[in-house]
Amino acid sequence: MASVTFSVPKGFTEFSGLRSSSASLPFGKKLSSDEFVSIVSFQTSAMGSSGGYRKGVTEAKLKVAINGFGRIGRNFLRCWHGRKDSPLDIIAINDTGGVKQASHLLKYDSTLGIFDADVKPSGETAISVDGKIIQVVSNRNPSLLPWKELGIDIVIEGTGVFVDREGAGKHIEAGAKKVIITAPGKGDIPTYVVGVNADAYSHDEPIISNASCTTNCLAPFVKVLDQKFGIIKGTMTTTHSYTGDQRLLDASHRDLRRARAAALNIVPTSTGAAKAVALVLPNLKGKLNGIALRVPTPNVSVVDLVVQVSKKTFAEEVNAAFRDSAEKELKGILDVCDEPLVSVDFRCSDFSTTIDSSLTMVMGDDMVKVIAWYDNEWGYSQRVVDLADIVANNWK
């Protein structure tokens, strides 16, 4: 059976979503191709604390549409393209940029590099990816999209706009059966983080959220800390790469700090990531809070968490707990790095979170500090594919 490297390629030209790179970080793991196909299939029963659901049988591929072909939309397609035997079939993209832009920006990416696939326009209404035709439509109103005509099963909602039931529900009105929001959902939309609470997924829910990239980084190792040592309270700071929601040069924005030039400043701003952990780990409600510092890097972010714990411990014991989880229930989700690396080294990491073991600290015997890296685009998009796989494998 073929083996794929579940790690980060080092050379810039290799940051392209390659399906067969032999380059890897010192802490990289090799998983079988079956394990890489989906985090669902690497250990379905191990995810979460309740023993998990059993993977269902998908007889035919589910038809998938991507709404919004921006950073997450394009990363999602590359991640999906790198999977073998996926139960998903991307057949449509809704984006206002049109076919030429969709094709060009998928092929050439300033962060990921050149996509190792034959990507080109196919007429005026579709793009071709290695010969696969994907229809491109353009409508800002999701309720008017041709999801019924195309037989769409799952919509990947990647605009960051339609994040409540009313907005995301427009895809259902248009004929789609399920919607996965690639952002924190608003209201009572169920939130799932793969490796944390995905075993609780209910097929009865037409709209679900994959949470934020930072919550996907934070929740897995917070789960370990709480289970092993008992979290009393804590605070988090994510030093986060700038995003499209900031201004390139000083310009109007509802957040006066985000109105300032993203590439020239450290920009303090809000994040709901810490509080959102309670959506997937309810016992931590009210125990965590945090802020974000947006910095002049285009990708990769790092979480700094400080918590007070009820069980006395020391740094080596904390790291040992992470290593144990990385080999068991959080395999493929959490990793531990022992090398003195920097942010660029984690670009295109498939993991949701990578603990920087040398930076783990314990003050006294009950205040724990943990530093964790994450690729806020690529790693997050891998989890979106995994969550879509969960939906597919539980299809009724």
UniProtKB/Swiss-Prot annotation:
Domain of life: Eukaryota
Originating organism: Arabidopsis thaliana (Mouse-ear cress)
Coiled coil stretches, renumbered: none
Enzyme class: oxidoreductase
Subunit structure comment from the entry: Tetramer of either four A chains (GAPDH 2) or two A and two B chains (GAPDH 1).
Keyword Oxidoreductase: yes
EC id: 1.2.1.13
Subcellular location, principal: plastid
Site (Activates thiol group during catalysis): 240
Record membrane topology: Peripheral membrane protein
Annotated catalytic residues: 213
GO biological process: glucose metabolic process; protein homotetramerization; reductive pentose-phosphate cycle; response to cold; response to light stimulus; response to sucrose
Reactions the enzyme catalyzes: D-glyceraldehyde 3-phosphate + phosphate + NADP(+) = (2R)-3-phospho-glyceroyl phosphate + NADPH + H(+)
Transit peptide feature, positions: 1-60
Pfam family of the protein (one): Gp_dh_C
InterPro entries membership: GlycerAld/Erythrose_P_DH, GlycerAld_3-P_DH_AS, GlycerAld_3-P_DH_cat, GlycerAld_3-P_DH_NAD(P)-bd, Glyceraldehyde-3-P_DH_1, NAD(P)-bd_dom_sf
Family: Belongs to the glyceraldehyde-3-phosphate dehydrogenase family.
Induction, as annotated: Repressed by darkness and sucrose.
Protein name: Glyceraldehyde-3-phosphate dehydrogenase GAPA1, chloroplastic
